[in-house]
Amino acid sequence: MINIAVIGVGRWGVHLLRNFLALPQVNVVAVVDPLPERLAVIKQQFNLDEKVVLTTQWQDLKGLSELTAVAIATPATTHYALVKDALNWGCHVLAEKPLTLYPTECQELCDLARQQQLILMVDHTYLFHPAVEGGKAVLQAGKLGDLRYGYAARTHLGPVRQDVDALWDLAIHDIAIFNNWLGQVPISVQATGRVWLQQQTTKEIHTSASGLADLVWVTLTYPDGFQAYIHLCWLNPDKQRRLAVVGSLGTLVFDEMSPSSPLTLLHGEFQRQEHLFLPINQSQETLELQTGEPLQRVCSTFITSILQNTQPQISSGEVGTQLVKILSALTTSLNQNGKLIPLNNS
C-alpha cells in the first residue's frame, strides 16, 4: 500500500485527490492546503476518514513516518522547495507542471531523486491523453510519409495570469506533445510576442521589460530539420486547442475542441502533371482511441512506477527538466526580439 499526501487541493489538486482516492493500492494519509476553509470543504466533499491529516502547513508531513509519496499541485514558484523537502524526507514525488521555473533547479531535483533512489514524475497530463498516444503510434507507423512541419494553436479569452506570460502558461502542452510524437527535442528555438494588457509588472519571474506577453509565436527546430510553429494567446475569443503534423502523405490533427473525433488523419498527396501539382487520394479518417481519463492514467502510472521501482518514461523528471529548458530558451528569445537560441541537450 502506498501512503500518499496531496499538497494543494485547488482547481487541479482536487482532481489528483479524487483519482488517488479511487486507486486500490493507495491510502491518502494527509491533505495540505493553506486555506482551512478549503480543507473543510474537501473533507466533506470526499467524506475523508478522521485519520486523514488535514493541515495548512506542509512541514507537518515530515512527522508522518508512514508517508511514501507526495503529490504537489501548488503554484510553480513553490515547487522547488516542496519537491526538495519531500525527496529529502524519502518520499516519491508527483509534481504539477512545470517542475520548477528554472532549469538548474529542475536538474538539481532530478539528481537528488536519483541519489535517493526515488521516483520523480511531472504531471504532463496531455502525454497520457488517448489522442496523443494514438498520434504517436501513427507517426511511428510512418503513415504520414516524410514529415514536413508541424503547427499548433492554443488560444482563449482568459484567464489572464499575473505571475507568468502566455508562453509559460500555455506553450508547455504543445511542446511536450511535439517532443513526444517526434521522439526528439529541439536544437534551437525562437519566440516573438506582443504585450497589451500588462505592460508593466512588478513580478520578476519570466517577464520582459515590456511586461507579460499576451500573444506569443513560437518556432521549434528539431535535429532532423523538422520545424513546429505554435500560436499562443489568452485574449482571443476564438478558443483553439489544435495541433497537427504535416507529412508527404497526409496530415495528423489532434483537435481537443472536437471531443467526438479528437484525432483525425487527413490523407492526400500531390501528383505532378506537367507544370501543375494536382491533389490526389484525398480522404479523412477518424481514428479509434482508447477510453479513460488522462489524469487517472497519470496517477496510476506514478503508483505503478513506485511499486515496480522504475522511472516513468513518458513524463519523468528528466522530461520535465527538458521542457523547462526549452521554455527558458524561448523566454530569452522573446526578450531579444526573436533571436535564434540554440539548445544544449546534453
Regions found by a protein language model. Name each.
Residues L64, A69, P75-L127:
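Beta-strand-loop-alpha-helix segment that lines the small-molecule cofactor/substrate pocket
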Residues T100-Q162:
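A contiguous active-site-proximal alpha/beta segment in oxidoreductase catalytic domains
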Residues T125, H206-S208, G247-E318, K339-P342:
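C-terminal glycine/acidic-rich active-site capping loop/insertion
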Residues M1-L48:
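N-terminal Rossmann-like dinucleotide-binding module
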Residues K51-Q57:
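Conserved SAM-binding strand-loop segment of SAM-dependent methyltransferases
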Residues G90, Q117, G225, N337-G338:
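Glycine-centered short loops/turns at secondary-structure junctions
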